[in-house]
Amino acid sequence: MARSVGVTLSEHVLAGLVVDHKLVNGLQRFPKDENDREALIDMHTEALVETICDEVLQVANGNKALASVGVAVPGLVRNGVIEEAPNLPQLKGARMRELLSGQLKQRGISAPVTVLNDADGYAAGMAAKLGKLDALVRVWTLGVGIGYGRYPFTPGVWEGGHSVVTLDDKERFCGCGGRGHMEGIMGHRAMRLRFLDMEPEEVFEAAKRGDTRCFQFKRLWHKALAAATASAIHMAGPGKFFLTGFNVRFVDMPMLRDYMQQMVKMSPLQSYSIEIVEESPETRVIGSAVSAEQAAGI
């Protein structure tokens, strides 16, 4: 059985040893404090690379004969290069696969390295978890930013979180600076910028109490999710969409379904479904390892 290491990079570095698409011995986390969500932002690229390699070495537990290493990062990744990373801007332009491979070889690990988008890693993890590695899986990750994950891997950009969902000139809260983006409405960072006097949790609580401004935003938030999902359906067809990430707690499924019904009217495209799944770091790590194994032809 192949022994691979999966790593995911977001607010923390999470790493785990994966054997036969299952996590072995739990996850390794950096930093150790789960509430420290700013540590990676302050680290330069070289320090991040060294940290990732240290975590890989620890979860390998002395056995350096790994089949592959998969590292999932937030941003636009092509051919091992991070071309854009709004939430970890120091990584922009980093030749991540090359840097990681070099550092791992210095530590005695010569396994092939795959660098992929973190949402794609989650989609691969969901496919492995469901035993559907031969099926199309699409995932929206609702967190600091918005990720769109797709499995199996298909060449393309797939930056679904930057889908344009409004033409309102005032919608400029996306981390990339673009106007009208889904992430500029739904992303946690964007919501904090919009409501400088309230946290996102307080906004949705106020919406429940009938606050007009907050309820209007709740509607906009769900319209953005519906619009991006409907666009994906109109481009690639219906099927199941999974919603995950720490902000799935804000999803009002009846409201979302109502907007979806208004936006998807062609009967052949109405066989879609939407399911909320609990945020799972384990699924992310397994998906990173599965993607690396497939890229290595294992």
Model-found features: residue ranges?
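Adenine-nucleotide phosphate-binding core of ATP-dependent small-molecule kinases
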Residues: 34, 38-64, 192-254, 272-284
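Conserved glycine-rich phosphate/nucleotide-binding loop
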Residues: 268-298
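Glycine-rich phosphate-binding loop and adjoining helix at the ATP-binding site
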Residues: 35-46, 65-69, 75-136, 252-267
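Conserved phosphate-binding loops in N-terminal lobes of ATP-dependent enzymes
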Residues: 3-75, 107
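Glycine/GP-enriched mid-protein hinge/lid loop-to-helix segment characteristic of carbohydrate kinases
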Residues: 3, 14-29, 37-41, 103, ...
